[in-house]
Amino acid sequence: MTELDINEIEAYNSNKMGWIELITGCMFAGKTEEFIRRLKVLSYAKKRVLAFKPSIDNRYSVENIISHSGSKLDSYLVKSSDEIKQIVEKENQIQQVDVIGIDEVQFFDENVVDIIEQLADNGIIVIVNGLDKDFRGLPFKNVDKLLVKAEFVTKLRARCHLCGSFANRSQRIVNGQPALWDSPLILVDGKESYEARCRKCFISPKKDV
């Protein structure tokens, strides 16, 4: 099972049980679109939802989480995982928080995984979105751990930019060519800097010698 329906959520919540849902995959796979959809469904179901995004990701908006297709959701822009915990604790004093959404989890510090677990242990549904692999094809931090810890995992695929086949890798492009191995790990530039690639079309970055 990769996602619960509202009736199943109500059954779990009757026991005040929290859990972790992870939405992952490569660039342009629709992760943020699915992330926003799930949080909106829960909001419509009268759950109190708070969403967070890392301050490094300001491609489209500072105040909203926005997908490549234009779907958007109000969010808190935070610099660290500790800010998430502080805001949730403050908001809980005003009204109970039922659901937390964390976008682009790979851009947060590594303490975010422990905080996500604490929130779930305290009865909060935590829905997380992030890339599973970096541009080198290696596991991305935080997502690699959440793949093990999450109760529900949805892995999405894109279409290969070159051949149209199923893609599960993110190719970083610099000056029309695949980036070198030693390029910075994090570069948030959207479609101008990345392409979804399949196994066959993905070019493993070369090490600069």
Curated annotation (Swiss-Prot):
UniProt cross-references to SUPFAM superfamilies, sorted A to Z: Glucocorticoid receptor-like (DNA-binding domain), P-loop containing nucleoside triphosphate hydrolases
Binding site for Zn(2+): 160, 163, 198, 201
GO terms (BP aspect): DNA biosynthetic process; thymidine metabolic process
Localization per record: Cytoplasm
Keywords: ATP-binding, Cytoplasm, DNA synthesis, Kinase, Metal-binding, Nucleotide-binding, Transferase, Zinc
Record-annotated active site: 104
GO molecular function: ATP binding; thymidine kinase activity; zinc ion binding
Gene Ontology cellular component terms for the protein in this record: cytosol
Transmembrane segments annotated in the record for this chain: none
Annotated EC: 2.7.1.21
Catalytic activity: thymidine + ATP = dTMP + ADP + H(+)
InterPro entries attached to this UniProt entry: P-loop_NTPase, Thymidine_kinase, Thymidine_kinase_CS
Record-stated family: Belongs to the thymidine kinase family.
Name of this chain's protein: Thymidine kinase
Originating species: Mycoplasma capricolum subsp. capricolum (strain California kid / ATCC 27343 / NCTC 10154)
Gene: tdk
